[in-house]
Amino acid sequence: MKTSLRILVAAASLGLSAVSLADWSNLGGNARQNSLAAVAGPDAATATWTRSDMPCLIAWSPITEGHRMFTVRQTYAWAPYEPPAADALVHCLDIRTGVTLWTFDCPFEPDDWSTVVYGARDGRVYVGRGGNGAASAARVHCLSAQTGAVLWVSNDEVRTAANEGIAFMDDGDPIFASHNEIRRIDAMTGATVWHSTRTCSVSGHCGPARDGDAIYIDETAPSGQRISRFSAVTGLRQYSSQTMPGFLNQNSPFCAPGGFVFYLRSSNEGPTVDLFYAFRDTGSGFELLWTAPTRYEPFARHGITPDGGVTLLSPLGHLQIRDQQTGVLRAESASPVLAAHGFTSSLVAVDSRGRVFHNNSNGAGDVIGDLRAFSPTLSEEWRISVMGMNQSPALAADGSLLVTGTDVLHRYWSAPCANADLDCDGAVNGRDLGILLGAWGPCAGSPCAGDINRDGTVNGSDLGVLLGAWG
């Protein structure tokens, strides 16, 4: 289904054109951790390559920069954790071909855990062996994205786990969060810029989201949880939301342009407390906008759509899109999207056309999960089934949909649209003109809607190219 003009113009107004990079740079795809990509994903379930020669026990998230994908294939997971060599190699693959470019065996010290690829940006890949809840602390190794060479090792250890992820500052500094702390590390040297304490409900699921100077995390509160804002510049705590009732929670917040902050607070305690929360950060506090009943989903990662929607599951397991500001239901899948066995942990990637790629796996290495592709109105377009599909999918800068399972890795990709065909409908017409005019002016980042010649500004030069391709 082709995307409407309304969706694409709204994308520009909501800041899709201002994303700093088109790469899937961390667990949630971007600093806001909202799983929205600035590229169009594949139109069909046709794999351009598959790797079946890298089996593992646990398949971790694919992280991308340019034409490179970074991921860990964990082959050892027994306690006590005394792994053999190469138990959790970092693999760098060429996204276009699937060929391995380099591997890295992160040094192991007693009490360390499996290697994690935390994120990648500006030619640097951040990996380490912290985590295991928050039981393991380890130094961060910064690698060259091109060669895998070690650029530096951090001064301090972090306890950030694979399910938490990091958030990048605009200057590239990574921000790590774990059960009891937040830490900003200098991207050039590995030195700690600042360190703050926090509290979190369950270790291993305490990730940060960043929007401008604001870092959003979840914290424990009397008889529940709350969202707290910290300064990304100083690390100082600024203010917190009201308490969201409930016992434990195993999800992290994510955010959207305009001050929206979302939190899936569900712990299988019933309809009065298993709720999806939408807040607005007013600059001095949090305003509760709405709540919606939802399903118990530990370790889930939902996302936003380019036209101002946000995804979640209904109590019966239907995928929904609700309005970010009002909570009004916009779309719902015709059927539930639940895992066949055990609990469901939704993992989504949303492309620039508003299409939602939904993984219903619960991360178990021996469980087959379904990855469904939905239109912006949540009509199912296609699906695939993959064993042990933990933490994927991811959308790379060229529109590749990357899927990591315990037995295979897949790349799904469709050829991009013509340069001036901004809505990918096969014609250059008034709809494309509307998109270009809606994005008129300087781009805050790249890619930028309407910037056809990629010079950083949507202007008369782009208009000339569009008019020259009319038809």
Name these PLM-found stretches.
Residues D87, L101, D122, A137, ...:
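Surface-exposed or flexible loop/turn and strand-edge residues in extracellular/cell-surface modules
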Residues W24-G28, L57-A88, F108-V140, E157-I182, ...:
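Repeat-blade elements of multi-bladed beta-propeller folds
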Residues M1-V9:
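Bacterial N-terminal signal peptides that target proteins for export
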Residues C92, C142, R184, R229, ...:
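Conserved blade-register residue in beta-propeller folds
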